[in-house]
Regions:
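Polybasic/polar functional segments that serve as interface/processing modules
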Residues: 1-141
Length: 141
């Protein structure tokens, strides 16, 4: 567990603070996730504008343990369409959440690779991908 995991969960209002580093992004996700306790696997996604702040709406979709092509394809296709209507410099932020404890799993790394590969295919600019379990929020990769 990292030093920042021992710190209190950041208040929710800090989720809209600028993201200027990977650690900032991790802290924004910590604020958005709140107390860590997950019953199902979800993929969370939000947009970070050119001002480097999260948009006010974060979405999530249920996912299976292993990535499925159509789900990843549809997400990236939708994000590309959305980004086409937004200011240049807007990026997508992704977080996988699910029950459990311990270090990053092979399956989580597979999810990260699938998401990254499909994002490249659709030219969706991604922030570093994170994962949250019942113990901590961690950078994937």
């Amino acid at each position: 567990m990292s030093h920042s995991e021992l710190l209190p969960i950041p208040p929710l209002h800090t989720a809209c603070d600028p993201v200027n580093s990977i650690e900032d992004l991790r802290e924004r996700w910590r604020a958005l996730m709140g107390p860590l306790s997950f019953g199902t696997r979800l993929l969370w996604f939000g947009l970070i504008g050119p001002d480097r702040c999260f948009a006010l709406k974060i979405s999530r979709v249920p996912i299976r343990p292993r990535p499925r092509g159509p789900i990843v394809w549809n997400l990236m296709s939708s994000l590309r369409t959305l980004l086409d209507d937004l200011e240049p410099g807007t990026t997508a932020a992704l977080l996988l959440s699910g029950p459990g404890r311990g270090s990053i799993s092979t399956i989580e790394l597979l999810w990260s690779k699938s998401l990254t590969d499909m994002a490249a295919r659709f030219a969706v600019p991604l922030e570093p991908i994170f994962r949250a379990n019942d113990e901590l929020v961690a950078l994937l990769g």
